[in-house]
């Protein structure tokens, strides 16, 4: 497929993924400051680390989420606000059916992972729970890759 085959799709993804993260952070920080701190967990994507063909606009927008997470983590750390992200791999869900890369026969996606099964939404819970509890009070600006071993950094 040609690069940016849909300009509207590119703009939408940037607005939702990058601008949405920035806007949400700006909206919640005042309340967190009043409470003496807080935790923000953004949702990035493992695609940023392996750049799948045909998804450049999506991958770039999720790369922006990772960059914003790092910057916001540095900017807000001294205010006791931790900003981190989770970067999931392709997750089997109703929303993914019919999208690029979703393979109901569980072919290439599973084969490229160290953990040989499809990822399901529940696989994100442990990472999310860690990032919202006091266990992660000294962690900020980080992105946890929850991709079943597809990408190792």
Where are these regions (language model features)?
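Single conserved hydrophobic/aromatic residue that forms the stacking wall/gate
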Residues: 1-8, 12
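Active-site helix of classical SDR
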Residues: 25, 61, 69
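Alpha-helical segment proximal to the catalytic Tyr-Lys
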Residues: 30, 74-78, 137
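Residue(s) in the substrate-gating loop at a strand-loop-helix junction
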Residues: 45
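Short C-terminal tail/terminal secondary-structure segment
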Residues: 50, 129, 140-153
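Active-site loop-to-helix junction immediately N-terminal to the catalytic Tyr of the SDR YXXXK motif
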Residues: 51-59, 71
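A conserved structural motif in NAD(P)-dependent oxidoreductases
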Residues: 113-124
